[in-house]
Amino acid sequence: MEIPPQEAPPGPGADADADAEAEEAPAEAGSSSGASPPTDGRLKAAAKRVTFPSDEDIVSGAVEPKDPWRHAQNVTVDEVISAYRQACQKLNCRQIPKLLRQLQEFTDLEQRINCLDLKGEKLDYKTCEALEEVFKRLQFKVVDLEQTNLDEDGASALFDMIEYYESATHLNISFNKHIGTRGWQAAAHMMRKTSCLQYLDARNTPLLDHSAPFVARALRIRSSLAVLHLENASLSGRPLMLLATALKMNMNLQELYLADNKLNGLQDSAQLGNLLKFNCSLQILDLRNNHVLDSGLAYICEGLKEQRKGLVTLVLWNNQLTHTGMAFLGMALPHTQSLETLNLGHNPIGNEGVRNLKNGLISNRSVLRLGLASTKLTCEGAVAVAEFIAESPRLLRLDLRENEIKTGGLMALSLALKVNHSLLRLDLDREPKKEPVKSFIETQKALLAEIQNGCKRNFVLVREREEKQQLQPSASMPEITITAPQPLEESGDLPAMGAQNGTPGPGPGPDSDSDSDSDREEQEEEEEDQSDQQRDEGGTDQSSSAPCPALLPSTDSLGPGDKSPPGSPSSPTEQRISVSSPGRGHKVFVVTRVESPPERPEPPVPPTSVSSPPPSPPSPPASPPSQTMDTQDPESSEAQPQTEPSQAGQPLPNGLKPEFALALAPEAPPGLEAKGSSCSLEHALHRSHGVSKLEELLLEASQEAPRDTL
């Protein structure tokens, strides 16, 4: 028997020898072309290479995501109905007559339609699949799926459609007891992904232990829901713990309705108390018809103390609360500043409970509505309530129905209403309570009528107060007063000083430009010239060439180069608008009539000295100027100055040819200064009686015209 030769183990230098052999191997392979691979089967290290494609070759193609609204563009009612019927035929399911009737009534398909009502219709999986043809084309504000007998498959299909097409902002899935875990999982996905969903009504739809984690996760991470109804959803225990823990981090939910869930006074109430400690965005918490008890109310009151700005409405109707729980609530009320509605109806509070609550209500100052219906109150408790009414300046409504409040309690309430001026509604039983003395029944009726009258009186006072507040201008709004136009004097003259500073009297005001006598004489001369011109023209051109109204600020608010000359003509029909604003002083605006706003105001031009006979006494104009300043249209006022060139072909009232008027100042802007000088020239020309005088005036006018038109 031959023994195979044994190889000696590699020595310390074996690794170095192996490396040397590996380096020599490529040289040997290059020398012998037909060399076989090495006997040990090892691959060469230099033969391993990795290559990557270029950037252009990495992406072979791209697919755009499907547009969910590709079917909803320019859709018609007939198209929607036809698509729905074809889907029903394809799926071999019945058509819903109620849906077809609603589709035929829809008119505006561009906007969200008010409501899609499928309440009471039995919806199986195939029927829900056919509804996709409607949801892919139309959007709704409310989708009502109440009591539609949804199963897991149908519910998950519908919720996926509503999430994908954003079909509703308000969704009602109440009274569907068989949607199961997959249905709630799809509903949670819809709540998390749909940004438009704001209202979810899941009353009488059980949310059990294995379904609650999905909903809790959706509410904790991201949800746009503002209103959540979970009445009679079997939340007691672990579902409520998961829900309350998730809502601690939710800042969007504002209304939470948890009625009829058999919530107990220990674990469940402790979770609600912790929720109120951390969540300050919740505004309405409805806990009616549960078993909170006094022990649970203690936990809730601990959370209420932290609600300085948050909870607005707390409903504790029918929770077996007694006077012991009212002591906890009375200590918590002074700490909350946001609670406005507190409903404690149908709890055996009794007179002692109202006394425990009274001091807290008086110290609270935020409660506006208080419900104490059917709380075992008698006249003694009504007296305590009356003390609170007398001390409350904000209480709006109080419910005391279904209590044994007789004559004594009604008298206390009536006296409190004489002091209170805020209570608008006090609910009491209409029928008087039985009394041993028959006359007391009539007294109760009289007291009830007196209480009603007191509430009506407060209502009238509140309305009057609101109207006064609306009429009072705010501090940031300027007060605008319009002064009536001054009556015309017999001479038809109005001082130009009053026209500029808005003062009714002829004396100089604090904002007048000049107090010198020469200015007054110039103003009187200008006014006489204007009245003479009106007499010559006979008022025939006043209506046709009436200038547009303008608001001219007072001269004290203008710059040194913007002041108009003191001799500018003033209209007797002007209106003065006085504007005062806090911190901005007092300004006066004068409503007058001008041809058009001047392009560049000029300094006052002294009137040319023209020798003319003394003017005749002014006569009143043929027709007084009509006050059309408030009724003129801006378009008509802009079109009026354009009618003046059409009058160039008519003879002028002073007997001059129209060509002379055009040659006198062809490029003159219609400013106030040019008007004043032209009026004085026309007056002088009209009063001259000789040809020589007329020639002198024409010569002077031709010399003065270029200077006036600068």
Curated annotation (Swiss-Prot):
Cited InterPro entries: Leu-rich_rpt, LRR_dom_sf, PP1-Reg/Actin-Interact_Protein
CDD domains, alphabetized: LRR_RI
Compositionally biased tracts (Low complexity): 27-38, 543-565, 656-676
Record keywords, A-Z: Leucine-rich repeat, Phosphoprotein, Protein phosphatase inhibitor, Repeat
Comp. bias regions, Acidic residues: 16-26, 512-531
Sequence ranges of Polar residues compositional bias: 637-649
UniProt biased composition (Pro residues): 1-12, 603-624
Modified residues (Phosphoserine): 54, 60, 581
Highest taxon, organism lineage: Eukaryota
GO MF entry, a single one: protein phosphatase inhibitor activity
LRR repeat residues: 224-244, 252-273, 281-301, 310-330, 338-358
Span list, region Disordered: 1-46, 487-677
Function: Inhibits phosphatase activity of protein phosphatase 1 (PP1) complexes.
Assembly with partners or alone: Interacts with PPP1CA.
Family from the record: Belongs to the PPP1R37 family.
Protein name: Protein phosphatase 1 regulatory subunit 37
Organism: Rattus norvegicus (Rat)
